[in-house]
A protein has these predicted regions:
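Active-site pre-lysine segment of PLP-dependent enzymes
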Residues: 1-10, 17-49
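Short, conserved charged micro-motifs
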Residues: 144-149, 186-190
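Conserved glycine-rich beta-strand-loop-beta hairpin in the small C-terminal domain of fold type I
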Residues: 87, 104-114, 126-139, 149-151
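Conserved core segment of the aminotransferase class I/II
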Residues: 39-104, 220-221
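PLP-dependent enzyme catalytic core of the Aspartate aminotransferase-like
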Residues: 155, 168-228
Length: 228
């Protein structure tokens, strides 16, 4: 904040997962310390319902006026029904109590994923230990490419987001993002088992070809899954 203050820059604080931390208290928002320089974004899609695409903005007055104009031009008639649903929910229900239940549920699912990764992933694989939110960031063994491996993972009926989706310069090809938001602990463990098997197969291929899977012929692929 001090650097942005000296450079006269605004800070955009996008914090949809801020209330879903696994510690006793949520992290303090940057805007709590700098009202005039921080634009804070929040969402009910993570703490109420995923289909409830309603969010909010806290911004300095001058910025807020510009945001209102931009919103009016990009979304002529935002749905009032969903906004009224959120309003009724906040007024009539213990929404903080609901958030606490979500935090416990996601903590259990995070622990299930971390335990499965520890038990099943081959050597050379590493991952983060998230303190909140929905995701684990996993780094594959050296020389592996997450994008090249994805079709074979889908064939095994498990999916992820390659790390390159989160960078503008192509970085992250060795990384993947895993979600523990929706599956039960049992399905999380099964998904990790399938992913670990795919990674082990990729490592075997690398030993045979002496190169990363990115360099394999384009025609190389596993058979499609039997969906019958």
């Amino acid at each position: 904040l001090e650097i942005c203050r000296e450079a006269d820059l605004l800070v955009l604080e996008d914090n949809p997962y801020g209330l879903l931390g696994f510690d006793d208290e949520p992290y303090r928002a940057l805007r709590a310390d700098e009202h005039d320089r921080v634009v804070y974004l929040g969402s009910f899609s993570k703490t109420f319902a995923p289909g409830m695409r309603v969010g909010w903005v806290l911004a300095p007055h001058a910025v807020r006026e510009k945001l209102v104009l931009a919103q009016e031009s990009s979304t002529l008639c935002p749905p009032t029904f969903s906004q009224q649903m959120v309003s009724a929910y906040l007024e009539g229900y213990d929404w903080l109590g609901q958030v606490k239940q979500f935090r416990e549920m996601y903590r259990e699912r995070r622990d299930a994923m971390l335990g499965a990764l520890t038990d099943m992933m081959p050597a050379g694989t590493s991952w983060t230990v998230p303190t909140g939110g929905f995701y684990v960031w996993l780094r594959l063994p050296d020389g592996m490419d997450a994008g090249a491996m994805l079709p074979r993972a889908v064939t095994a009926r498990v999916a992820y987001v390659p790390g390159t989706a989160f960078y503008a310069d192509g970085f992250g090809s060795q990384c993947i993002r895993l979600s523990y938001c929706f599956p039960t602990p049992e399905r999380i463990r099964e998904g990790v088992r399938r992913l670990a098997s795919v990674i082990e197969q990729e490592l075997e291929l690398r030993e045979v070809f002496g190169t990363s899977t990115r360099a394999l012929p384009p025609s190389y692929d596993a058979p499609g899954p039997d969906l019958t």
